[in-house]
Amino acid sequence: MTQMLEARKGHITEEMEKVALIEGVTPEFVREGVAKGHIVIPKNKFRSRDKICGIGGGLDVKVNGLMGTSSDRNDMEMEAKKLRILEECGANAFMDLSTGDDIDAMRKQSLTISNIAAGCVPVYQASVEAIEKHGSMVGMTEDELFDTVEKQCQEGMDFMAIHSALNWSVLNALKKSGRVTDVVSRGGSFLTAWMFHNKKENPLYEHFDRLLEILKATDTVLSIGDAIRPGANADSLDSAQVQGLIVAGELTKRALEAGVQVMIEGPGHVPLNQIATTMQLQKQLCYGVPYYILGFLATDVAPGYDNITGAIGGAFAGMHGADFLCYLTPAEHLGLPNEDDVRMGVRTTKIAADAANVLKRGGNAWNRSLAMSKARVARDEKVQVANALDPEYLESKLKAEPESHGCAACGKSKCPADVAAEFFGIA
């Protein structure tokens, strides 16, 4: 029984109770959101963990981080360190995107050491194994692809990015679109090559009901991958992207009817003046299910600083209804992130999420911001550290300058808080 089917029966599960407690809402609010598909709770029935999060309407914007091996860097211990950093810095979920030597071992390690929601992209492993077995990923059979999905579900993955919304109608729109960047999704490119080589429909689209049955058995959340997402601001909201979103909406309806929790993966590169429109289209076409975005990157000209461009776009998107932000690190478009990149990526994306969450007056983020402001006036460093998004950094700065009044701009003798306290009695 999935969380969604339980909710539709009027049952409030233990996971719904936990989400309600964390979010400061009623369990009934969470149950109703899950029943409608507006909230998902990534929690595979075969995986035990303490940290539960809800993603969707009326809840705080959540943050996802990425890790995983590759053929260029196959260091499982480094990926374990990255995963620990992700969790320590406050990520709500992670995705293991491994394509290195032993993908199974890497995934099992990630599931074992983490205590947050775990996601993956099954077509990555299926493609790597097809290269080993058939000499090319286009030799992958449909059964091999679905067997990989089922294996990863049975091992405990809480959510999966699966590129089911790629079909010939989307590729035909792409060919006519005059795009700058064509296909930038790794999973999307694998399946595009498979379709053209085999002259067949995408099996994840054609046999979508088979996919739903696999996911339903373990209550793994379906994240409909954005196989045709724009890879440049110039391509945002082109015909290919919109056609992909239309197909995603059709599949969303079928997932909801089957009682499978579902969210939509979005772009990517979106200029600020198109963020509201992008969000409105997704929510309208996809029945209000949660939107999981990869940024948004607000500009294309800042390699080395894409954690910042992503945070700018992510904050705007969160304000307009995005539910789940995938982090970007300074290494985006440059190479694989190291541990420092991961730390910076989570921190900046958490700032973006908080900027959106604080708009809910009286919510968790608002109350935290208010507590920080009051602590600054009172010069209560302990409370400031407790409410900081990066408490370790703040504490280290305070310890480095123990005699400081806390503000290098004014200094102790001209502190506005002191002036206000003395003459107005308001501090």
UniProtKB/Swiss-Prot annotation:
Keyword RNA-binding: no
Catalytic activity: 5-amino-1-(5-phospho-beta-D-ribosyl)imidazole + AH2 + S-adenosyl-L-methionine = 5-hydroxybenzimidazole + 5'-deoxyadenosine + formate + L-methionine + A + NH4(+) + phosphate + 2 H(+)
Nucleus listed as a keyword: no
Similarity remark: Belongs to the ThiC family. 5-hydroxybenzimidazole synthase subfamily.
Keywords: 4Fe-4S, Cobalamin biosynthesis, Iron, Iron-sulfur, Lyase, Metal-binding, S-adenosyl-L-methionine, Zinc
Enzyme class: lyase
Entries under InterPro entries matching the protein: ThiC/Bza_core_dom, ThiC/BzaA/B
Entry cofactors: [4Fe-4S] cluster
Protein name: 5-hydroxybenzimidazole synthase BzaB
Stretch forming the signal peptide: none
Coiled coil region boundaries: none
Gene name for this UniProt entry: bzaB
Function, in words: Together with BzaA, catalyzes the conversion of aminoimidazole ribotide (AIR) to 5-hydroxybenzimidazole (5-HBI) in a radical S-adenosyl-L-methionine (SAM)-dependent reaction. Is thus involved in the anaerobic biosynthesis of dimethylbenzimidazole (DMB), the lower axial ligand of vitamin B12 (cobalamin). Requires BzaA for catalytic activity, as BzaB alone displays no activity.
Originating organism: Eubacterium limosum
